[in-house]
Amino acid sequence: GYAQGGARVTVSSPGGALPISLADQVASHNTRSVPGFKNGFDSGDIVFVFGGNNDPLTQAALVGAAATTPAAAVAAVQTAGTELATLVKNEILAKGATRVAVFLLPDGSASPRFAAADAQTKAFVAQLFAAFNTALLTGLSGSSAQIIDSGAIFAAVRANPGSFGFTNVDSVACSAAKISAITGGQVTDGSSLFCNASPGVPFNGLATGASASTYLFADGVHPTTGGHKFLADQVWGKLKEFGWVPSNL
């Protein structure tokens, strides 16, 4: 699996941990030559594509900084959604994969990052994520890719958290203050990359009273381990629906 912090669909730019675009990641997979590892895709693979979240987040930040217009931002995320669909069709499906699941993005405006934003900002952020998803769906129309709507999945848990074992779906589990202390002031945004739930000091970065199992969000946009398990459980059910794994597993 590939997971690179800050990655966008086709733009490789500074920021994040290893911000190589999804397009470059797939190209590398298709052309790599590593002893003991195959390159490319085949019918034995189950391929998950869950990316693009940083495109609407980037555009929202640019609009907030008056570095672009709202109309240009919407157009940019539409382009990114279309580019992701093209990537899936031309570089994954056309290269041998037959079981490909593509995730729609969850509504970023409902994440803790925008909890303090005004209604207009939240509405615009929601518009950006919806525009990306619409372009992605349109671009994949007629292809064999299966769609997993992560937005609907997370909306369900926000609507009734207790039924899924969560006690908090609004606040972050990681403490920005503790992480700042742990990193000597090098990380001040509470990024979950630097958040450790292991008990005891000095490296536990959880907020007082928080739980990595029962809080949905670790930081402003990333799920906790409990959030990831919840998503994985839902995806496992989808794989059964698709007929990709036995229904009795």
Predicted segments — roles?
Residues P56-A75, G108-A130, A156:
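Serine-dependent acyl-ester chemistry module
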Residues G40, T86-A101, A131-I148:
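A structural motif corresponding to the C-terminal end of an alpha-helix
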Residues G1-T82:
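Conserved SGNH/GDSL esterase-like catalytic core that processes O-acyl groups on lipids
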Residues P112-A126, T138-V221:
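Mobile gating loops/cap/lid regions near enzyme active sites that modulate substrate access
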Residues T79, N90, A94, A101-A117:
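Structured, solvent-exposed acidic/aromatic patches
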Residues P35-S43, V47, L93-K95, G142, ...:
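Extracellular/periplasmic catalytic domains that process cell-envelope and extracellular macromolecules
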Residues L22-Q25, A80-L84, V88, L128, ...:
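Stable alpha-helical elements in mature extracytoplasmic
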Residues G1-Q4, D45-G51, D55-T58, L93, ...:
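Structural recognition of the beta-strand scaffold that forms the well-ordered cores
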